[in-house]
Regions:
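Catalytic cores of nucleotide-sugar-dependent glycosyltransferases that transfer UDP/GDP/TDP-activated
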Residues: 1-405
């Protein structure tokens, strides 16, 4: 518990070994070995280096990258959670393990990128982004130190971008009324308050703000459903001229607007959002997650906010669009591949964080102008969002054609 990265790495090293040993016994029944992220990356190396895993070499081995920022870095030797301790029969200085930045580190993800037959990330835009180096000064998330390896893979025809799909078997048929939504929120807050008495004051604040809004239909309902991490909320809390982007967004709204934000995660981000909610009742911060509540929020909102700093694919924007709620997004990764500015939603970009904040605000003001002043145009955008389809059958066909054959 005091060393979670080491503990997790050891667990996944054991998982790779155990999965490989099982596959050796059942290799004739398999055609493709599909690995995901660093957690399974060592299996690609074991397939190459362990004599007992020789039978696995006839299997096509492919890798999907969901989050390149997490790479499972561990010492090569000299630590209980090191490559030498996990696999004493193998060379801890194996070049397949080399990290492009740190000489004494074993990088499971780098080993997999070097070893597998094909690699994909979960959107075409992200597959292009990761070929460039990450530049935090520009607010750009790219190859996270592995861009040269990925450039080599792309040059070899081994790197692909395949957009994730969305389930369309349960499309909301009707938009809930605001009264229906507030009833769902109120019931959820009561349940959470009973389960988490230490957070009761936060839930009471959300209930109070909600009660102020429920007496009449808000002029516009903004929504967000998210894990609260720097990736998801960092731009909202970025400060320019002494105030956050979230404060700017709230100030741009009519007095009878509502922003429902559902999510939990980083305690510092939770605290910051609670402080914003305490000073502006238009923000209803729902700390936690409930799938029925999330579905109600997706179905009942007018505009869904997703200004992620990076987003390999994203799924929340697909859920919102499926329900007929246009999205305002940062045009990165899968958000760029799913939300088309002024067609089925709104998007922004910028060469640095300051420009991204300014352009997000400009996009927000534009979206409100369309919503309030051009109702027919807004309905066209709603219809385009609802009609968009990102099918798993299409993704599966691409996996078969590009990765498995």
């Amino acid at each position: 518990p005091d060393n979670p990265f080491a503990t997790d790495a050891t667990k996944f090293a054991l998982l790779s070994l155990a999965a490989g040993e099982w596959l050796v016994r059942h290799a004739d029944d398999q055609a493709v070995l599909h690995l995901h992220d660093w957690h399974a990356g060592l299996l690609a190396l074991l397939r190459e280096r362990l004599p007992s895993f020789e039978r696995l070499k006839h299997l096509r081995c492919v890798l999907t990258l969901h989050n390149l920022a997490l790479q499972g870095l561990r010492p090569r030797r000299g630590h209980p959670s090191s490559f030498e301790r996990w696999f004493p029969e193998l060379d801890p200085d194996d070049p397949l393990l080399s990290d492009p930045r740190y000489a004494d580190v074993a990088n499971p993800l780098a080993a997999a990128i070097r070893s597998v037959d094909h690699i994909n990330t979960v959107s075409p835009t992200n597959a292009r982004e990761i070929l460039q180096p990450t530049d935090h000064a520009r607010g750009f998330h790219g190859g996270e130190g592995l861009e040269v390896l990925l450039q080599n893979a792309a040059a070899d025809g081994r790197l692909h971008g395949i957009l994730n799909g969305c389930d369309y078997t349960a499309i909301p048929q009707h938009r809930p009324t605001f009264s229906d939504l507030t009833d769902t929120v109120a019931a959820t807050l009561t349940e959470w308050s009973d389960q988490q008495p230490h957070n009761r004051s936060l839930f009471t604040l959300a209930s109070r703000s909600l009660n102020q809004a429920r007496h009449k239909q808000p002029s516009i309902i903004l929504t967000a459903v998210s894990r609260l991490t720097d990736q998801k909320a960092g731009l909202l809390l970025a400060r320019t001229q002494g105030i956050t982007l979230l404060q700017q967004l709230l100030r741009s709204l009519p007095s009878d607007a509502v922003l429902l934000l559902l999510g939990s995660g980083d305690p510092g981000i939770e605290t910051a959002l609670a402080q914003h909610a305490a000073t502006d009742p238009r923000l209803v911060f729902l700390r936690g997650f409930s799938e029925p509540l999330a579905n109600a929020v997706f179905a009942a909102g007018d505009l869904f906010l997703m200004p992620s700093t990076f987003e390999p694919c994203g799924i929340s924007q697909m859920y919102a669009m499926r329900a007929g709620q246009p999205c305002l997004v940062h045009a990165v990764g899968g958000l760029n591949d799913t939300v088309k500015d002024n067609i089925n939603g709104f998007s922004f970009s910028g060469p640095n964080p300051e420009a991204q904040v300014a352009n997000c605000m400009a996009s927000m003001i534009h979206a409100q102008q369309v919503f309030f002043d051009q109702p027919e145009r807004w309905q066209e955008i709603v219809d385009e969002a609802r009609a968009a389809r990102f099918l798993w059958s299409d993704a599966a066909a691409q996996y078969e054609a590009k990765m498995y054959v």
